[in-house]
Structure formats: structure tokens, C-alpha cells
Amino acid sequence: MDTDVVVESGHYGRLVVARLKPNEDLIESLENKCLEHGIGRAIIRGVVGSLIDASLERGYGNTTCEQPISGPGVEILSVFGEIDLRDRGSPNTVLSGVVADTKGQMFAGRFRRGANLSFITIEASLQEWISD
């Protein structure tokens, strides 16, 4: 696997605690919260809530596959990743996590943009990353 590694120094900035309302997409909504607060890059500190259905991506490169998880009421167990909006025309947001379906079966992968709508609400905390 050929992977680029970037090491940078920086510090944490503002903390945003956000509530996503029903039928809002996880990735798009968190990106919008960053834009509302003038944040170009943020890390995910924590997320709780549920999704109507979930859609995760697994694998790497040409060997990726979609993992649909049927709801309603798919529980979010963990979310981690980074929101990068420095290139406004092409956001680079990668959020990964673990969810559980209505039977308690767990699934892990990268959340797919536009395919993970909040069920009731989702609460998330985002922390700004400022490069030195």
C-alpha cells in the first residue's frame, strides 16, 4: 500500500457542540457547522445519536464496497475523523465509525456522504485544528 504521510505541528482552537436535526446528513451537516463558525479544519471529539439508515464504505482503492445498514434507528457507537474545508470547491472530509443495527449487530467503516441521515437528533463536538 502506497500511502502519503504528512506530519505537521499545530494546536487546537475553538470547540463547537452541535445538534443535527432529523433528516440531516452527518457529513454535510458537520461541514456546514464548521463553515458557520469559520472553521477550515476540525477533528471529531464525539458523536452520539442515531441514523435512519447507515451507509458505510469498507476497503481501500479499487477494492471498496458499500455496507448498507437498515433502520430506522441505527445507533452511532463511535465516530472519528477530520473535516477539511480549506479547498471550498472540494471538501476533504473523512469520518469513520462504528454503528449498530436494530438487532445489535455492529458494523464499521467510513461514512458515505449524503447517505447517513439523522433519525431524531445527533449531538456532535468538533474541535478546530490550527496549523502552525
Description of each model-found segment:
Residues 1-46, 52-132:
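N-terminal intrinsically disordered, cationic/polar leader segments
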